[in-house]
Design a protein with these regions (language model features):
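Asp-box/WD-like beta-propeller blade repeats and closely related beta-sheet repeat scaffolds
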Residues: 46-88, 92-93
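Short loop/turn segments immediately following beta-strands, especially the blade-tip
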Residues: 27-30, 50-60, 83, 103-114
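Extracellular cadherin-type adhesion modules in metazoan precursor proteins
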Residues: 1, 90-92, 106-111
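Short, conserved, GDST-rich strand-edge loop motifs in beta-rich repeat architectures
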Residues: 35-36, 101-103
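WD40 beta-propeller blade core
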Residues: 2, 49, 99-101
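Short loop/turn segments immediately following the C-termini of beta-strands
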Residues: 41-43, 93-96, 105
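Generic structural motif
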Residues: 22, 77, 113-114
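Blade-loop segments of beta-propeller domains
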Residues: 5-46, 61-65
Length: 114
């Protein structure tokens, strides 16, 4: 994953593998700071990888940054944050079976889901 400023200058490069779809949601308290949580499907390892975006816009590596799926070939991804009950869900598609899987994030340090 590359990040850029508004003039197109590269700010960061995170060599995480083949990240396919990315989505993010705001206002999480992780590692004692308020951040946005970025999730992306990693096609090399069939998992969901995570990065943190600080309030200053900087993207940081997240030490506990992945969740292994049982999918054969992860592909599409989107997130949903239910503000009524403070739950976050990630929906992932499997390219081979065309199935859609739903995961609920149950903790953030380290990332875990069910």
């Amino acid at each position: 994953i590359y990040t850029y400023d508004l003039s197109g200058k590269t700010l960061n490069y995170f060599p995480m593998g083949r990240i396919n779809n990315i989505d993010l949601r705001n206002d999480y308290l992780i590692q004692n700071r308020t951040v946005s949580l970025l999730a992306g499907t990693n096609r090399d390892f069939n998992r969901i990888d995570f990065l943190l975006i600080g309030s200053n816009g900087n993207v940081d590596e997240y030490l506990d940054n992945s969740f292994q799926t049982e999918l054969t070939s992860v592909y599409g991804l989107c997130m949903f944050k239910d503000t009524d009950n403070s739950k976050t869900f990630i929906f992932v598609t499997d390219e081979e079976s065309l199935a859609i899987y739903q995961y609920e994030i149950t903790s953030y340090a380290p990332i875990s889901a069910k």
